[in-house]
């Protein structure tokens, strides 16, 4: 469960929206951050059934997953079952602010177009009356899906609960029944914190034939992926040691644990036999981002052992370097792949969200796999998203000298998919790399912006640009030379993305290693979907999700996309392809689907 206190600001002024409608009632409780250990904020009781104003559509995405209205956060329990993809998610039925969380539920056959159903889980038992928080789905032998999720009781104590589909012959699995013995797991062991015990993983079977599952928790004041065993998935016993723990933080949210094969983008099902040579990834949501480690699952010790132990978690690898949190992966048996997606929060203000009538979205589903060198995960948008492409344009053989700006015309700059390869004629001019930059790549992106010339770079894309460039977002690369390798910095700079002063407008960034002596091309793919921008650099080595709110979105046909180079070295573009993206059908029904 991604706790909203980590992101939201106090609701101080609600503006004209509230003035014209009503004054909401505010509540304060520990889950809203009033427990002394978290930042305090107010959770608003939003209008039950408002019609969002027309301006709400200005920033609303066309092909990202989000409900028709109201607040959403973490993906919870995605799965593929009997020909249908299911996306469960944290959802507030009552308004566009955090609170009253239930499990929203949508289904799809292609991961692009979604039908919205009634909530799968609502707050109606003592063990989840304060919220049906994040969890997972595991498919048991015989094709029996089972939900395990975190619930909060009236005192905000957290425990794990189970639910089963009422009718497995229903292709959409609309109704779920909670187990009579809920909660099945309580934080009653010595050293555990009862309000920091949440987000169970998908289960897997160990060599002894017993089910295992990890739960994010605080143990003796430090973070841990707590490990549990079960014969039947109903009765669980805590293992005397965690799957993995770290004493540098006190809570890991939304842990995810899965197997990967180096250099193979085929997915692996944890409940099946894991092939020789496989690695494991342990992901955790911490410090407002999703980080991960690559290692092995030691069957003898029943523990995760990272390949490299890095004490400073600022140096841990990230799933995404932007506005991306609480990600969840699942094994897609339909196409033998592992898919991951995460929550991208709004970076405007809570009063803006009330005015829009909605808040939050999920990133485009991504295939995720392990690079051939076994050092990092790679990600790429699922191929199904390409079904929305239309109006393709292509350019080959471009040369970008220092200061050049090439406009990519004839695509909808609000909804576009752009793929571009940059080729370096020479790498001799690369500036020297400072290893201290790895501690804070965002700071370096801010200090060395797209207008600051370097030896090689910056070069990349300018997107959502107004006519006079007073609003624009830059996604670009810089190339550096260290003693033994080349390092590429990828940035998504939002500082001039909007004229509005009341927004979060950082310069996101991440580094990746690249063997430029063998391969001189660096690829960039950017998907633009109004207020959501997702960029994939170096074949998915660095991914950055950004949220932007430019005024230019109000002027149809007035935004621009450019390729640029501000570095001293000339950059070639052997291939540039761009498409307008059609609108997907995403939870468009008014009310719940009646099918």
Swiss-Prot record:
Q: Can you tell me which residues are glycosylated?
A: 167, 235, 247, 566
Keyword Disulfide bond (UniProt): yes
Q: Which residues are responsible for catalysis?
A: 74
Mind telling me which InterPro entries this protein's record contains? ConA-like_dom_sf, Fructan_Metab_Enzymes, Glyco_hydro_32, Glyco_hydro_32_C, Glyco_hydro_32_N, Glyco_hydro_beta-prop_sf
The reaction(s) this protein catalyses: Hydrolysis of terminal, non-reducing (2->1)-linked beta-D-fructofuranose residues in fructans
Description of how activity is regulated: Inhibited by sucrose.
* Annotated GO biological process: carbohydrate metabolic process
Q: What keyword terms does UniProt attach to this protein?
A: Disulfide bond, Glycoprotein, Glycosidase, Hydrolase, Signal
Which pairs of positions does the record mark as disulfide bonds? 445-491
EC numbers? 3.2.1.153
Secretion signal, residue range per the UniProt entry: 1-20
State any single GO MF term.
fructan beta-(2,1)-fructosidase activity
Superkingdom in the source lineage: Eukaryota
Q: What does this protein do?
A: Hydrolyzes inulin-type beta-(2,1)-fructans. May play a role as a beta-(2,1)-trimmer during graminan biosynthesis.
Q: Which family does it belong to?
A: Belongs to the glycosyl hydrolase 32 family.
Task: Quote the protein name from its UniProt record.
Answer: Fructan 1-exohydrolase
Give the species: Aegilops speltoides
- Top-level taxonomy: Eukaryota, Viridiplantae, Streptophyta, Embryophyta, Tracheophyta
Which gene is this protein's source?
Answer: 1-FEH
